[in-house]
Amino acid sequence: NSLAISVMNQWPGVKLRVTEGWDEDGHHFEESLHYEGRAVDITTSDRDKSKYG
């Protein structure tokens, strides 16, 4: 929640989105933590890539 709140405070009206938390399709490298359910891919709701670090 703290990351989502930080996003909303930095950019009012923008929300944090989790796009993938478990990789079933093999899109990540072989040793990725996505295969253990210990990693997530995230974006912002406006999908503005200039906000990504």
UniProtKB/Swiss-Prot annotation:
Which positions are annotated as binding Ca(2+) 2?
A: 20, 23, 25
Which pairs are disulfide-linked? Answer: none
- Annotated Zn(2+) binding lies at 34, 41
Primary place of residence?
A: membrane
GO CC terms for this protein? extracellular space; plasma membrane
Its annotated function is as follows:
Intercellular signal essential for a variety of patterning events during development. Involved in dorso-ventral patterning of the brain and in early patterning of the developing eyes.
Q: How is it modified after translation?
A: The C-terminal domain displays an autoproteolysis activity and a cholesterol transferase activity. Both activities result in the cleavage of the full-length protein and covalent attachment of a cholesterol moiety to the C-terminal of the newly generated N-terminal fragment (N-product). This covalent modification appears to play an essential role in restricting the spatial distribution of the protein activity to the cell surface. The N-product is the active species in both local and long-range signaling, whereas the C-product has no signaling activity.
Q: Name one GO molecular function term.
A: patched binding
Annotated source species = Carassius auratus (Goldfish)
Q: A GO BP term, please? A: neuron differentiation
Ligand binding (Ca(2+) 1): 19-20
Similarity remark: Belongs to the hedgehog family.
Q: What name does the UniProt record give this protein?
A: Tiggy-winkle hedgehog protein
Q: Name one Pfam family in it.
A: HH_signal
Q: Where in the cell is it found?
A: Cell membrane; Secreted, Extracellular space
Q: Could you read off the lineage of the organism from its UniProt record?
A: Eukaryota, Metazoa, Chordata, Craniata, Vertebrata
Keyword terms of this UniProt record: Autocatalytic cleavage, Calcium, Cell membrane, Developmental protein, Hydrolase, Membrane, Metal-binding, Protease, Secreted, Zinc
